[in-house]
Every structure is written in structure tokens, then in C-alpha cells.
Amino acid sequence: NGYQTAMIGKWHLVSEPTGFNYWDILIGQGDYYNPKFIKNGERVQREGYATNIVTDLAINWMDSIRDKSKPFCLFIHHKAPHRTWMPDLCDLDLYDDVTYPMPENFYDKYEGRIPASKQEMSIIKDMDLVYDLKMADKENEIHTTTGLEEAGRNMYNALNPEQKAVWDKHYDPIIAKFKQDKLTGKALAEWKYQQYMHDYMRVIHSIDRNVGRVLKYLEENGLMENTMIVYTSDQGFYMGEHGWFDKRFMYEESFRTPLLVRLPGGKKGDVDEMVQNIDYGPTILDLAGVEVPADMHGVSFLPLLKGEKVPDWRKSLYYHFYEYPAEHAVRRH
């Protein structure tokens, strides 16, 4: 129907994108700092912080590359807040004065749920001091047993000298105090949780700031009132519930996925009906006036966004996790 399409940021599939008029994607998961991209088949490294770079590329495409006489569909896919939660340099001190409340089930004993106890996403035993919590000391005295220490040190070494100077100013005192305190047991577990939460929230703050940049561009260029904006993720995440980080296990914290939609003229407030990510494609096609292919999974929830009642809307969902052993050793369920 005449739409220009673009994919910018995290792709994380084996193949290169097809069916897009323009694409500029991170290689693999992408790196937080000085990430490598593939731009329409050509590899290029860009200096800076991934969240800012992806946003810069997206705004540049809207402003300077697309044909402004045509409608467009743009996917802006960020690496953040994926592991390892490396904050932007300007956010390193953010929330320093905050102590995050512990989830009530942080020390879950998994009574009657033995399979849930046999995984490798425990903050206490699986969150790596160097890879996840940035304890890459220059004396090389902090060592870990998860197999991720080298990768953590490589992430630090990938920073340029200017970036390292700012990074060190923040983390060197934290590393020194950690060595001095020699934490064990619950004290270590709760220290890990606080470090994790601080870095995660800093990374989220950067996402929030950059979403604001996109919205500001749309507003300033008269695009807000004829553009549907979708903010979502590929799953929820554990923020210490059951003592975990990551996702995969089908408790509500992981199963429920963020989804915010702004549809000009659409319903305001919450929509209570259950939707899935397989519904996104049909919804976007429906809005664009394109017939949804018969073999496409999911259904359009555009009527729900307009405030319409759909009497036969789904009342249940099916979940199946089958990738065992794979990463984090979550059992099939």
C-alpha cells in the first residue's frame, strides 16, 4: 500500500533482513559501547552508546532518508535493557541514593516446584561479578566460576580511553569497597541485587530518554496525529522475584510483556483483553489497509485499540518452553 519500511537496531536473527526498504542492524545481540552494525550488507562500527546511536539512526532515517511523500513503518529495536545492563556514561551516578526493596520471594525455596529450582538464572549463584556486575578490577584479583569472567573483561576493554576514564571514576570505588567488605551469604546476594537493580534502572532511564527524543521528533514534524506508536518488548523480566534475573520460566513476571500503544483517535486507558506478540503483525497490516495473509498467526487487535468490544476474543493462552538445556538451563515446561 505504498509504505516505506525500515528496520534499525537489534535484529538478532541468523539471516539478514528481507522485505525492508532500508535496514541498519546490530550484529548479534549488539554491544552497548561502540557497537558494530550491518547497514544494507556493509559492516560498520560506530562510536558511542548503542541506545543513543540507534535513536540517532532512526531519526536520521525519518528526517533525511525516507520519501516524505509516502507513509512509513519504522522498527526501532534497542539492545537495552538486555544483559549486561551497561549504563550510558551520563547515567552512571543515577539513583546512587536509592535502595531498592527486595521482592518478598527473593529467597524462594521452590517448595513443591522442584523443576523451578533447577535453573541457572539465580542472582545468588549465577549472576557473574565481572560480566554482570562490572567488577573487572585492574589488579585481576576478582575471579568467577560461571565462565563469563573473560567476556566481562573484554566488554570493559572495548571501551575507548575517554569512555574508560569516566567508567573507572564510577566503578573503581565500588570495586575497592567490594574487595574490602569481603561479602558472603545473604549480604553478598543482597549486594548483587542492588547492583543489578541500579544498572538496570539506569539502562531503562536511557531508553526512556531516547523514546522521548523520537516522540519529540514526531511532534515537531507534525506526525503525531497520523502515526500509531507501539512501545513493547519480547517478554517480561525477573527483577529479583524468586531470586532470579532473566526470563524464560513462565511465571507472570516473565510471561507478561510490556505493551503501550498510542493510536490517534483510539481508546484511552487500559485494554484488559489478552493479546500476544503474534498479534502485532496482523494489527499493523490491518491499520495499513493490507489484507492479513491466511497463514499468519495471531489476529488484529485494532478493534480493541479503537474501544470496540470483540465478543469472541481469546480467554486463554498457551505457553510452551522447549529450549532445554540451552542458556540458563531452564527445564522444558
What kind of feature is each model-predicted range?
Residues T5, T51, T55, T227, ...:
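Ser/Thr-centric signal marking residues that sit
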Residues I8, T232, N277:
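Generic enzyme active-site microenvironment
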Residues W11-V14, T232, G298-V299:
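Conserved beta-strand edge residues that scaffold enzyme active sites
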Residues G30-R46, D63-K70, F75-N226, V230-M274, ...:
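Active-site-proximal cap/lid insertion segments
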Residues T51, T55, I204-V211, N277-G281:
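Short alpha-helical patches at coil-to-helix transitions and adjacent helical residues
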Residues L57-N60, R213, D279, S300:
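Alpha-helical elements of Rossmann-like donor-binding domains used by nucleotide-donor carbohydrate transfer enzymes
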